[in-house]
């Protein structure tokens, strides 16, 4: 597994570097320049299946993202920034990372890795920028937990997830406060679903519906930004993330909504992160 992650990371970095280097003379290189970035986060996760926590204790999440970040002046104004970050991530959410006396339940441990993309528009003043964003990712996740005190119903509910890597998706809303050139902090909230089984056709169609909605929202907010770019940056943030939150609420009971399917294992996580851009 470690070899797979290392190989995956190497190919990702190589592809981005190749893109930056292999440019034609007709392309504005600075427009497409992406800078390497490292993001480190800590958060608190609540676990549930169909709204039931199945007696799983809350987990402290530690996460690292390696990626490439692009910030360029948008066509909507000199102080409006178009922000995008493509990344690989590795995370561990464990009850051992959140050792408190008021955290009852079954001890658990989760490892997850995957790829993601975050984007948004922000406002820049000198070296300080406010960059609200939305993010989507695909992940492979393994959950293990202590069955010593688990009931038969709890064991049955978690049987499809225990000890195996499962595919899943997530959405994240956050605000990137760039304090100075190359350093920023982000408060953020993530909903991450882990699927007990893969149903490619239903998953594909559910994702097509989800991203079609995002495409329409992007078109709508672009019209707002033509007239009021600062307000449009935050309208884009609110609409995209409100839409994703609603869509994931519909998926809480059916992982491939609107198609009949079972409930996913869900992580709801509040996080605080910091990013170094080189």
Language-model segments: which ranges?
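Short glycine/proline- and aromatic-enriched beta-strand/turn motifs that initiate or cap beta-hairpins
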Residues: 21-81, 85, 91-97, 250-278
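Outer-membrane beta-barrel translocator domains and adjoining extracellular loop/strand segments
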Residues: 48-56, 92-104, 143-156, 197-204
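Repeated loop/turn-to-beta-strand initiation elements of outer-membrane beta-barrel proteins
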Residues: 72-77, 127, 177-185
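Predominantly the C-terminal beta-signal and adjacent terminal strand-loop region
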Residues: 180-278
């Amino acid at each position: 597994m470690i070899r797979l992650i290392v190989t995956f990371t190497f190919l990702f970095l190589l592809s981005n570097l190749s893109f930056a280097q292999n440019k034609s003379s007709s392309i504005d290189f600075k427009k497409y320049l992406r800078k390497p970035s490292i993001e480190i986060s800590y958060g608190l996760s609540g676990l549930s299946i169909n709204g039931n926590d199945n007696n799983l204790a809350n987990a402290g999440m530690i996460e690292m993202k390696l990626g490439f970040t692009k910030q360029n002046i948008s066509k909507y104004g000199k102080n409006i920034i178009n922000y995008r970050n493509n990344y690989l991530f590795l995370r561990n959410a464990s009850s051992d990372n959140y050792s408190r006396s008021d955290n009852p339940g079954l001890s658990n441990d989760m490892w997850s890795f995957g790829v993601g993309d975050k984007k948004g528009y922000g406002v820049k003043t000198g070296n300080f920028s406010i960059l609200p964003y939305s993010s989507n990712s695909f992940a492979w996740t393994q959950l293990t937990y202590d069955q010593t005190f688990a009931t038969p119903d709890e064991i049955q509910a978690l049987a499809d997830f225990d000890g195996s890597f499962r595919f899943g998706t997530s959405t994240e809303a956050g605000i990137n406060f760039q304090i100075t050139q190359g350093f920023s902090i982000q408060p953020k909230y993530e909903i991450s679903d882990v699927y007990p089984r893969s149903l490619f056709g239903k998953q594909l169609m559910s994702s097509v519906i989800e991203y079609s909605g995002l495409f329409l929202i992007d078109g709508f907010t672009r019209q707002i930004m033509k007239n009021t770019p600062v307000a449009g940056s935050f309208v884009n943030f609110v609409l995209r993330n409100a839409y994703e939150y609603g869509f994931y609420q519909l998926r809480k009971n059916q992982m491939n909504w609107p198609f009949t399917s079972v409930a996913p294992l869900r992580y709801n996580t509040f996080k605080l992160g910091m990013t170094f851009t080189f």
